[in-house]
């Protein structure tokens, strides 16, 4: 009998990914990567992986699950080296499977490299066809990029003597062909390389250790290992870290540079202790609540936030409107993102496994309930029912972002437009569907002002439908896996040979 997997995050955008790269001679780089990935666990919980090099070979360990599930003292001890990269993954192109776990490894033409990716390419099918790749042999956009780079390195190896900079030159050739969202960390035996797409959809920053350098998706990944924040990697920038220090080059045409950081990094994705555009994410979320209170005040007894990312906005709302803030929902911190339930009756209990009401806060009170977003509405509706049962007199829902009406193709998994509640219902209809006494969303202008960045440049396509990079009509999460043909056996066998080194390393370490 088939069991269904029920998500606890139906009313929030699904995670992006987290990447880290560390160059630190004399330091336990595998352990530093492990700690930094812990700080980025919120960005992806499907799989985790680390690749390291001792200057002669690359070793990769990756598996499905959380960072703490994949790594232990024994696996980390097997990851020798003074440089390494890591990734926590949530699938946005390609299914959730070991084959698509990262870092992606290639070892052809006597040149090894590994790649970690946060984002989502929008021209994958075009790139695969241009490269003459057999449909079905590439199952994620990250794997596709690695294949393109490997082919370019192979082409150069046939015409030039090796000087150790083949990966850098291969990237300079391949990167201008890529469209969409990508923050990459890459490594060969001697270099760590970081790349941010010309729009800067996903964050990437540079930090300094006493004896090395760090690249990471968010600043807490620097803090946890004692690295000092230096700066954000600019949109369209490529940085190369080696024994000689840090170099920066611009591999993209200047006309493609158009900073549009995903605004939902401020709303939901990033940790509250992250700095983006030099601004505190936590303080930005508090300001969102303050703007929301000015925009949509209501008479109430208590303001409460939906854990976790709704809490700072709720605190800001309460402060501005001068109504007491109180915790009204307790989150089970040890529940996974999904659980397996055999029938609808048990599936309907999903929200109760994640959240439990504090009746002393709720019973007999008029509540303002603040959350960061509503995507599908199923979890919010179940939560409202739970609050009613706990004795709420009134429930006024306040959302610290505008209505989520359009799917994201730049590194978030939001489903199709038909699944998005605000794309199909008016605000009044959503209010009726949720069974709340009132509903209000923060305006886009107020959201952007709350970030405190002086309109530094944001993508808000999921709110407006204005996509900064063109989207193919047939783009989907599994576009590379849903190709016309399955790979022939000979090609599949060849791919096993190509990736055999990484699989052998993985199995040996986990024996």
Predicted features along the sequence, with ranges:
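Conserved short alpha-helical segments that host acidic/polar catalytic motifs at enzyme active sites
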Residues: 1-235, 240-300, 306, 394
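Flexible loop/turn segments at secondary-structure boundaries
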Residues: 29, 92-93, 123, 193, ...
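Generic beta-strand/beta-sheet core signal
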Residues: 116, 187, 195-196, 207, ...
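A conserved beta-strand->alpha-helix junction
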Residues: 143-148, 325-336, 433-451
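Secondary-structure transition/capping motifs at alpha-helix termini
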Residues: 155, 295-301, 319-326, 361-363, ...
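Phosphate/diphosphate-binding loops
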Residues: 173, 221, 228-229, 233-237, ...
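PRPP-dependent phosphoribosyltransferase catalytic core
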Residues: 175, 190, 226-232, 385-511
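Short, glycine/charge-rich flexible loops or terminal/linker lids adjacent to PRPP-binding catalytic cores
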Residues: 322-368, 378, 405-413
